Amino acid sequence: MDHIGRFELLISEMKADGRYRTFVELERMSGQFPAALLRGRDGRSRRVTVWCSNDYLGMGQHPDVLAAMHDAIGRFGAGTGGTRNISGTNRQHVELEAELADLHGKEAALIFTSGWISNLAALGTLGRLLPDCAIFSDALNHNSMIEGIRRSGAERFIFRHNDAAHLDQLMASVAPERPMIVAFESVYSMDGDVAPISAICDVAEKRGAITYLDEVHAVGLYGSRGGGIAEQQGVAHRVTLIEGTLAKAFGVMGGYVAGPALLMDVIRSFADSFIFTTSLCPHLAAGALAAVRHLKAHPAERARQWENVGRLKAMLRAADMPVPDTPSHILPLMIGDAHLCRRTSELLLEDHDIYIQPINYPTVAHGQERLRITPTPYHTEAHMRSLVDALVAVRARLGWSTPRVAA
């Protein structure tokens, strides 16, 4: 087989479809978020405004977080020197896990090197260890959840997105004595919609199923202490396992799962993606711990973000931009064509110093291409006006029509 030819063909097909991804080299500037320096191919840099960061609350540059990280590096060095089982567990890990368990009202928590790994480890392990397990997965679940379920080898049932009635139908078709897991998200990252957690728990509880809730795009952002949508809706006690990330609203890196102590012990003891990897660096755990503690006690960042989300959404819709009225902080601007989406992103960056990464297949379905806008507490009204004016200008230049979106 001509391996080189095969690989070249795959890349050329991606480029022809408008799906080829390029890296944009950015240098974040401490204390100046959401501004960053864009480094061009010629080595020159210029200042741009970032509108697609997952550092939702700017905690990646918060003084408390940075101070904790600097202190940890000075005291403990860079890495841990081992896995959690072999010399790689430290005080920062233990305190962070206790803080996360408290955040969600659970008995215990377990941290991982990323949110992707935490889903892979937890779902992959639990589904594998439960004999004849059936896993029920929302149709729009994240890739990490899909891969974890696939890796478990358990039989998978896909229920229509956010459709508790369809979930009930599927669960009724399975023998009641089989172990069952219902896996879903609270805030869906591409559409910005929110799951009916209580209704899904109603169905799961009726069948005696484990509920597994991914709160990656909600922790830190929702609830009186940043415990996510489940905390905000008062249903966290009904969810068996809550998974989250330390790399978005908390601004650092890593992932975690919180739940019953027995299940945490099972994952810790049987998940190869936990057992056989070096543990999270002490300064990352220390920074995440500072972020979690700050957001538990201080709602100011959340309040400012919500003000900005509402303000920008109103401005975009007043300009007839195709932004659905989502209930979350995520504002998808629907383009519906891969090439136009990519070119829109390029022109925003080239002509207006605004960076929003295009979202194309396979992250979203063909025909659902979009720009994913994430306002933060630190975007100003001037930033918003510049963004709306730039989008109006780019739309006029490219001639893309405004797709119909939900009111």
Regions found by a protein language model. Give the residues of each.
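Conserved PLP-binding catalytic core of the aspartate aminotransferase-like
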Residues: 302-312, 317-353, 361-363, 367-368, ...
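N-terminal "arm"/small-domain region of PLP-dependent enzymes with the aminotransferase-like
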Residues: 2-6, 10-76, 209
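Active-site phosphate-binding strand-loop segment of PLP-dependent enzymes
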Residues: 55, 157, 161-213
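Active-site C-terminal subdomain of aminotransferase-like
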Residues: 207-210, 217, 222-327, 339-340
